[in-house]
Curated annotation (Swiss-Prot):
The gene is rplV. Keywords: Ribonucleoprotein, Ribosomal protein, RNA-binding, rRNA-binding. This is Large ribosomal subunit protein uL22. One of its GO terms (molecular function) is rRNA binding. The keyword Nuclease does not apply. NCBIfam families: rplV_bact (TIGR01044).
Length: 113
């Protein structure tokens, strides 16, 4: 049995979010939250929120035991970029891309995963 949670349009670069996500893939939920608590990264806060949501979905919707949950799948997809202009010298302008991410977390029982 598995449960899923998705956070969309998170204002953090997908590349930086993937670095955080790689730390907790395959770990137990409690262990993953402990790792994220001490990860000094903006993406860690967003990933923590999604992992907690997936665990709550598993507990509430599927009556699964929270201690046995494992992060079976976790991945980050690229969302739309916000394009901004940075004025430069001599009337020029540079484009700044504010990247967004979609974070997906799937938790399952230890028996299956």
């Amino acid at each position: 049995m598995e449960a899923k949670a998705i956070a969309k349009f998170i204002r953090v670069s997908p590349r930086k979010a993937r670095m955080v996500v790689d730390l907790i893939r395959g770990k137990k939920v409690e262990e993953a939250l402990a790792i994220l608590r001490y990860t000094p990264n903006k993406a860690a806060a967003a990933v923590t929120k999604v992992v907690k949501s997936a665990a709550a979905n598993a507990e509430h919707n599927n009556d699964m035991d929270k201690e046995e949950l494992v992060v079976s799948q976790i991945f980050v997809d690229q969302g739309p970029s916000l394009k901004r202009m940075m004025p430069r010298a001599m009337g020029r302008a540079d484009i700044i891309k504010r990247r967004t991410s979609h974070i997906t977390v799937v938790v399952s029982d230890k028996k299956e995963g």
